[in-house]
């Protein structure tokens, strides 16, 4: 079964992709599982080198990736360029973090207690449609740095930048099977990843409602779960703030900046934290 990918700004088709189902999901998990022993044994310095190479490739292909992101998400190219630049920064950061997560040796009475940090195994990464490349990098970076292998499921509406990132992982020298990208429905591919016994962890960004389903599905195999749900992005206004600017910026509906920021990508107007004195004296604003 094929999936037609649209540019939401023009509603024009921009790609036709094969949709993964349960069988393809199982195959991807099997590939990731087979790649795990060798990848987890790669020396930290070598993993860091590969992540730096990946970051460099993102920088070298920034314009291409930005145009993919702009066309697939329907956002201005200027914003997409900034987001892809941040993707490279994320991979650079985790390249530097590879040798910073380690265990401890703790002296105790009559002996020594030691802790070790080890990769989990296969992790399922499920990302939303609003910042597909950015959020994919937030999940790919730490998973790769720690020696895990990956099945990445982008939103079926916006899979194109994730596919290109998967190709760049191979170009960077990350072995085949370490990063697997699946295009398919959340109710099929996502659900199978959540319930699969060989997936050790799920990292999900999306709605609170679906997050509850992720927790319920993962409970059967007692896998670890990281959820980023229903962000409120509250505005915090202190006593000495410029209230005119705060009042204007909070709804994010001003021309140009606000209209793009509110184009069904993210919103900020639902929450505001005010200093108590402001509530007492200037609540009218």
Predicted stretch roles:
Residues 1-111:
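N-terminal Rossmann-like NAD(P)+-binding subdomain of aldehyde/semialdehyde dehydrogenases
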Residues 101-176:
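Conserved small-residue-rich beta-alpha loop and adjacent elements
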Residues 112-113, 180-200:
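A structured beta-alpha segment of the ubiquitous adenosine-cofactor-binding alpha/beta core
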Residues 117-122, 146-148, 175-177, 197-200, ...:
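Short coil/turn connectors at secondary-structure junctions
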Residues 148, 153-155, 183, 205, ...:
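Short beta->alpha connector loops at strand-helix junctions that form conserved
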Residues 162-171, 187-196, 209-220, 236-240:
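Active-site pre-lysine segment of PLP-dependent enzymes
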Residues 209-285:
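ALDH superfamily catalytic-core signature
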